[in-house]
């Protein structure tokens, strides 16, 4: 079989019929029976992003991580000392069995959660499908891109993403943006085989008749034959040979910072605890096992699962709110945005533009203006925007009553066109009428039309465009703009040579025939949505290519206060430093090119803002790519959907507001777990240091530490589903390692104080009272003393860790001002009561736990109440000092 390069070269050199024969297809496309055969022969149209992990690998990765490796080392050491090296009759594998069981339980829970999350992500990704138009059995069909096979004949038009490597077999004014492959930012014209002057066989990317997967159509139309699919395409080859790098989000960076902080703490604490206990007890092996257990206790090993569960839960809820998340981390980023940049069309307005008035240069209704506008909109092969559709619809309506606009598509035929671009802000078509007269008809932004017009037409009479007429036109248009009407100018020139090769230089010395006034009414939901976003700390900025007066009028109608308006022409004269200052106080940016939009967003980001960009057009893709969160809609062009991180199933700011709130809920519940766990573990450091220095025995057996840690983690599984205070949702939130470390330093030591109080009560009061003797009363009595002491601290640790969750989860008073989710109440109480019941269960002898008397539980209740009151007092001081809690 030929290589992909050989196939492309052969298609350029051989007659088209020969190429059709090679792939058993025709100009009418593949027949259904041939589709599967070609798929088997040439492969599927899927680029391998990395082989999907096998089930065994997924299980392995769920169970094996740095923390479980430490646990398994402890289990191995315990097995060696308590089974392998133990004397006959003294062998006890209990600790090893418990540790291995806990590892399997923890890994199993994570594995199940990961499977659920993967399934949720897969279901969500299937909700957004890029499609292509193919010819099968001579009829057009819309199919998912991954179902395309070699030999398919596809139809391409403006806004499409090219789904495979193809050769053009027919084309009309077909321009492609292939900067992703070549780095060249300008659109490149492609022509079909029969029109190509020559083909560059040395650099296939420069071939006039080949187009490649991943590039997108800027304007025009084409019919193409699919030659190469999937991994063998140019894009597929690049994917296979380079490591794609995604810049880590602020969330990922802060998570890395926190992880390394915990690792450093562990690396310091484990050796210290090992040395102190070894010197105190003289049992270095036992000290080593305990030190490793401390290492496990200091690490929130369930953190990856909690994060995954929070993000997956958030994505599922958002899907119900018509928000599809393409990347899970985008949920948190969406909640963090404090500036939303968006175009006004379809966001603030209804996306249903109506042509209100076709006007001559003096502002009177004139259907000859509509006639020429129709020729431009109907015959252009670019993506027909809302105004093109409005022109065509109005013409069809008027054609029922007025002959001047009847049968225009039959009375004219197209010669050529000059596609729209964002520099000229206009587009032209060249048409010939039944009498053989060739004309160029141009429409575009009024200022641009005045710049290329030398004459004006009024009631059939052509005069020179004077400054007086120019000012009259501008004044009339300004008045329309202030009413919220968008205005396009229409110019033309006649008696052209149809054999001429037309270019943008021909757009000159034209006759301005009039202008078109469009109404794009505001959405009823726009005003409340903007108000809601503002209440959530999100500033809305409008970035548009439209006229500033129209944009201002629309903004006023939807209640968006316009602080300042900045034009694209002004931006071009500014340095980045100047623009960075101005963007802070500007609400509306008008008459922008795509590059200017992207530059504004970069300036906002450099100023420290988290920026979301919402768009749906070809020109929006660069802005979405540089923003923190790219937002699009399911009706957007393919390239916009491909670039977006978040896709709305309804182009409505109200929908976005719901997604933003859910993002903040996800952040809130993840930060709860991290701050609670890190502060609790930090407090344990001081408790264990004190115990290691002042107690003549281990305050808790290694197996106790491990069981305690696992049950506490299981009690936190419900946190992703916890309620979040409404006040917390009102501000954008970003991850800050400093905030987490500060929280840890304030809250952690409080638990240490009460742990030490528990030590003192157990050592000097409770254990002697229960046993009738102190620690130094013989070896057998010492063993009993240690068991009761360890049981007492084991239970107190669980109660303090789980009950304080309710104090820490909100800055408000728990249960009175802020109610936790029912699942959080159930899991925390279940964990506390389960641990409390262990000394009275059959597991007591296995875990070496002892029953406690009533006085212990009275004192335990007092300690927990005092602990929670102390946390409340410190919480108030902390909030007053730092103006934040979570």
Q: Which residues make up each language-model segment?
A:
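Acidic, divalent-metal-coordinating active-site segment for phosphoryl/phosphodiester hydrolysis
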Residues: 527-529, 535, 547-558, 595-603, ...
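Non-lumenal N-terminal regulatory segments of integral membrane proteins
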Residues: 1-140, 146-149, 154-162, 167-247, ...
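Helix-interface capping motifs at the ends of transmembrane segments in multi-pass membrane proteins
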Residues: 73-98, 261-299, 312-322, 500-501, ...
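Alpha-helical transmembrane segments of multi-pass membrane proteins
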Residues: 64-84, 100-110, 129-130, 260-278, ...
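Hydrophobic alpha-helical transmembrane segments
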Residues: 95-129, 136, 246-339, 516, ...
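Membrane-embedded transport module
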Residues: 273, 304, 311, 558, ...
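Soluble-to-membrane junctions at the N-terminal ends of transmembrane alpha-helices
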Residues: 44-76, 118, 140-141, 201-210, ...
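Cytosolic catalytic regions of ATP/NTP-dependent phosphoryl-transfer enzymes
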Residues: 210-218, 333-512, 518, 531, ...
